[in-house]
């Protein structure tokens, strides 16, 4: 039994499932999770002293790499002044100005402490601003664990939402409508049925919780037009894609302007931070200037703001996103080439600093239905063989992978060499 195995057994005695977020339990791939002791650059190190090339990056935030000196120095300097004040600080203003500078659609922004908090606050604001109750989300898109967002479609796109987790009343879930990602007709049909009841569309511009599914051409622009036609707000959930796909997020990359944007992950530099922002007239509807209530004890925490600012400033350096995109393309195309070499069918998607691969015979994967038909058993085999090779991927067939600027030629080549060996083994099974 490894030290990670021992720690997992110990953790299960005091922590539900032994983890503080379900995907970490390795339920999607089997076996025991690796307990991590430290991380540096492109690498993480487990409790048994094994070193891995990391393509999880704490699920997205570590875009500069782990333990980056600029972020570490900013945090240590901030700690000298105190950990939390529960009062306004100049750092919050600086952070807000930086976000607004980088994302043109955001005129005002409020800091919170998580992505879930950002999305649930943005939806409450949209409902209050429009005086409408219903929201429209997409099958396979994840926006945090707020009650109204843990809902999936029933049979057919026009079916009222059904809870996808116990503990969510059906009377509450009925206000959440679910359409098919990358299918404008399904969205139009729902709006035709509820033309004056839908407050907002919320969308992952690149769906990163059904692996990695970019929008097809015109999809986001079509959603913008539908929102304008029916007087609904468009919320782009950039918790994952914000400052990872491009300097101005996925909305900048694809050329679409939302009414509200939610942010998280990268914005915190590894600290727990979220944010929501957008049009000034909408943001002025939030307390204390408006009637929609939202608050948070640790919102705008000075340590988190310091870490986030250090990361955001580094991301404004010239050529950063071109480097990141080139590395991501190289690793994704390399995975596909290695799989094809050994006769294993694979589809890939990638954009900016995120990627996904699918064990499927289909040439392209663009929606949740296709994702659910992929070979998850083969993924689990592949996952553990790569883990044995010292490559740490997301332990789920439904999660995106993330590159960092710390991934250099050595790490990329070592990863692809490992993949070649693993695919060779899988081809012989």
Curated annotation (Swiss-Prot):
HAMAP family: HemL_aminotrans_3 (MF_00375). The lineage of its organism: Bacteria, Pseudomonadati, Pseudomonadota, Gammaproteobacteria, Alteromonadales. The modification N6-(pyridoxal phosphate)lysine is found at residue 265. One of its GO terms (cellular component) is cytoplasm. It comes from Shewanella halifaxensis (strain HAW-EB4). Its EC number is 5.4.3.8. One of its GO terms (molecular function) is glutamate-1-semialdehyde 2,1-aminomutase activity. It catalyses: (S)-4-amino-5-oxopentanoate = 5-aminolevulinate. Belongs to the class-III pyridoxal-phosphate-dependent aminotransferase family. HemL subfamily. Its cofactor is pyridoxal 5'-phosphate. It comes from the Bacteria. It is found in: Cytoplasm. This is Glutamate-1-semialdehyde 2,1-aminomutase. Homodimer. Signal peptide: none annotated. Pathway: Porphyrin-containing compound metabolism; protoporphyrin-IX biosynthesis; 5-aminolevulinate from L-glutamyl-tRNA(Glu): step 2/2. It is an enzyme of class 5 (isomerase). Transmembrane segments: none annotated. Keywords: Cytoplasm, Isomerase, Porphyrin biosynthesis, Pyridoxal phosphate. GO terms for biological process: protoporphyrinogen IX biosynthetic process.
């Amino acid at each position: 039994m490894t030290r990670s195995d021992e720690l997992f057994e110990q953790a299960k005695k005091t922590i539900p499932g032994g983890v503080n977020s379900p995907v970490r339990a390795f339920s999607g791939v089997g076996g025991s999770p690796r307990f991590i002791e430290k991380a540096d650059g492109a690498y993480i190190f487990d409790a048994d002293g094994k070193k891995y090339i990391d393509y999880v990056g704490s699920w997205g935030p570590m875009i500069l790499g782990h333990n980056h000196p600029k972020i570490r120095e900013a945090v240590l300097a901030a700690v000298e002044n105190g950990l939390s004040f529960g009062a306004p600080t100049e750092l919050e203003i600086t952070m807000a100005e930086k976000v607004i500078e980088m994302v043109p659609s955001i005129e005002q922004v409020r800091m919170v402490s998580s992505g879930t908090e950002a999305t649930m606050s943005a939806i409450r604001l949209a409902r209050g601003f429009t005086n409408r109750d219903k929201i429209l989300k997409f099958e396979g898109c994840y926006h945090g664990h707020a009650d109204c967002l843990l809902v999936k479609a029933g049979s057919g796109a026009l079916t009222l939402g059904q809870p996808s987790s116990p503990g969510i009343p059906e009377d509450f879930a009925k206000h959440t409508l679910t359409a098919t990602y990358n299918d404008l007709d399904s969205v139009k049909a729902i709006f035709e049925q509820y033309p004056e009841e839908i407050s907002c569309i919320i969308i992952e511009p690149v769906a990163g919780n059904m692996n990695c599914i970019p929008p097809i051409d015109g999809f986001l622009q079509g959603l913008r037009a539908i929102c304008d036609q029916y007087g609904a707000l468009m919320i782009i959930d950039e918790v994952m894609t914000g400052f990872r796909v491009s300097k101005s997020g996925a909305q900048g990359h694809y050329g679409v302007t939302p009414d509200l944007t939610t942010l998280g992950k990268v914005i915190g530099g590894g600290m727990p931070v979220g944010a929501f922002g957008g049009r000034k007239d909408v943001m002025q509807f939030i307390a204390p200037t408006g009637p929609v209530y939202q608050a948070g004890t640790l919102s705008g925490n000075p340590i988190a703001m310091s870490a986030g600012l250090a990361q955001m400033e580094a991301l404004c350096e010239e050529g950063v996103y071109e480097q990141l995109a080139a590395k991501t393309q190289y690793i994704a195309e390399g995975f596909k080439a290695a799989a094809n070499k050994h006769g294993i069918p694979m589809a890939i998607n990638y954009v900016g600093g995120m990627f996904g691969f699918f064990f499927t015979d289909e040439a392209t994967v663009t929606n949740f239905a296709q994702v659910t038909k992929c070979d998850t058993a083969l993924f689990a085999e592949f996952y553990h063989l790569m883990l044995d090779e010292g490559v740490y991927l997301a332990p789920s067939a439904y999660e995106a992978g993330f590159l960092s600027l710390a991934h250099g030629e050595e790490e990329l080549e070592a990863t692809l060499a490992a993949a070649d060996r693993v695919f060779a083994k899988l081809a012989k099974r």
